[in-house]
UniProtKB/Swiss-Prot annotation:
InterPro entries: AAA_16, ORC5, ORC5_C, ORC5_lid, P-loop_NTPase. Keywords: ATP-binding, Chromosome, DNA replication, Nucleotide-binding, Nucleus, Ubl conjugation. This is Origin recognition complex subunit 5. It comes from Homo sapiens (Human). The keyword Metal-binding does not apply. GO terms for molecular function: ATP binding; DNA replication origin binding; nucleotide binding.
Length: 435
């Protein structure tokens, strides 16, 4: 369809395969289709656009929002019921608790005149969350066409491969369709398609080319690149607006935007500030080369003990384990730094990067640097989990490892010094590299 080619860019092959699988409205389609690919590879957009453009009866459900079996099944049934009763405008809420009830109610809903002779499509986005629900749910959806004896196709959209889904007991195999990552040429074409009407397509394409030249090595997420393109474009065309350069003066435009793109690279994915705050920061910033206001330690707020946990984690990451006695025991005797040095330790630990440490060592350092007695309560452990969620600590290894969890501290020296100052702790005195 020519209309689809203009709306769905760089996914012609996938659209063609899906159209051939869907077939005619009254034909029985493939019972289940598994679509997978990395984030922002167009899975959801292509599927929704295709179903809407072809005006096929479908329901779209996000498995993150419907996090229980009952929520998921009721959402599907009520959306289908709304489709079937759209003509008379009245519909009642359906309740459903088991998959057996779902099959029975699904048969009733799809007997409506406008759903009877055509394929109904159920789209389950973020389908990887189905694995955390009841064991019979995934095999049931894969065989829904057979169980309900209805013309229905279930589409699973996921970021992980089918092999991670397949139950050990076996199941009906879906048709698997892969959405590859967009190439740099694809991204150039898609992003250039968004050009503002007040500027020429060539001018915006040149800007996108510069943007991808800076960000493509660190970010290939279409959503993030599109956000960055919108955010930084006013700064790129600023010399043109002021009359200081023409649209073809790419060298001058590049010199103007370069420091701001470098600054934006520090916050890819982070969303530390809103778009409006970013624009205000660009207007107020007299020194574009300085990374002002974007560092997390300028506005991060942590509970009192979380700060000490983070400090203890930093010390555990950057101090050799055998130096703990020197720093944290009162009667350790006089030990010179030269006694610790080995040939491979001539390089600073800060240059080598953070090293993993066990939970026991973290707690031992925490108890020695906090003045008051801290009991190892659930509150302390929940604060450690919160620091992992905030990505100030990272969990190293697998959750099911037998020797207990290991962590790494991911913050910089400037960050931890700023945190330490808020609790009057001189962290430099406790760092092996600064002896």
């Amino acid at each position: 369809m020519p209309h689809l080619e203009n709306v769905v860019l760089c996914r012609e092959s996938q659209v063609s395969i899906l159209q051939s699988l869907f077939g005619e409205r009254h034909h029985f389609s493939f019972p289940s289709i598994f679509i997978y690919g990395h984030t922002a590879s167009g899975k959801t957009y292509v599927t929704q656009t295709l179903l809407k453009t072809l005006e096929l009866p479908h329901v779209f459900v996000n498995c993150v929002e419907c996090f229980t079996l009952r929520l998921l099944l009721e959402q599907i049934l009520n959306k289908l019921n709304h489709l079937s009763s759209s003509e008379d405008g009245c519909s009642t809420e359906i309740t459903c608790e088991t998959f057996n009830d779902f099959v029975r109610l699904f048969k009733q809903v799809t007997t409506a005149e406008n759903l009877k002779d055509q394929t109904v499509y159920i789209v389950l986005d973020k389908a990887e969350y189905l694995r955390d629900m009841e064991a019979n749910l995934l095999p049931g959806f894969l065989r829904l066409q057979e169980l309900a004896d209805r013309n229905v196709t279930v589409l699973f959209l996921s970021e992980i491969v089918w092999e991670k889904f397949r139950p050990n007991t076996g199941c009906f195999e879906p048709f698997v369709l892969y959405f590859p990552d967009y190439s740099i040429g694809n991204l150039q074409k898609i992003l250039s398609h968004d050009h503002p009407p007040e500027y020429s397509a060539d001018f915006y394409a040149a800007y996108i080319n510069i943007l991808l030249g800076v960000f493509y090595t660190v970010c290939r997420d279409l959503k993030e690149l599109r956000h960055l393109a919108v955010l930084n474009f006013p700064k790129y065309c600023e010399p043109v607006v002021k009359g200081e350069a023409s649209e073809r003066d790419t060298r001058k435009l590049w010199r103007n935007i370069e420091p701001h793109l470098k600054k934006a690279m520090q916050t890819v994915y982070l969303r530390e500030i809103s778009s409006s705050q970013w624009e205000k920061l660009q207007k107020d910033d007299t020194d574009p080369g300085q990374l002002k206001g974007l560092s997390a330690h300028t506005h991060v707020e942590l509970p009192y003990y979380s700060k000490f946990i983070l400090i203890a984690a930093y010390l555990a990451s950057y101090n050799p384990a055998r130096t703990d006695k020197r720093f944290f025991l009162k009667h350790h005797g006089k030990i010179k730094k030269t006694n610790f040095l080995k040939k491979h330790e001539k390089t600073s630990n800060h240059l080598l990067g953070p090293k993993p440490f066990p939970l026991d060592r973290l707690l031992a350092i925490l108890y020695s640097i906090v003045d008051s007695r801290v009991a190892p309560t659930a509150n302390i452990f929940s604060q450690i989990t919160s620091l992992v969620t905030l990505q100030l600590l990272t969990l190293v290894g697998h959750d099911d490892q037998l020797d207990g969890p290991k962590y790494k501290c991911t913050v910089s020296l400037d960050f931890i010094r700023a945190i330490a100052r808020t609790v009057n702790f001189d962290i430099i005195k406790y760092l092996y590299d600064f002896l």
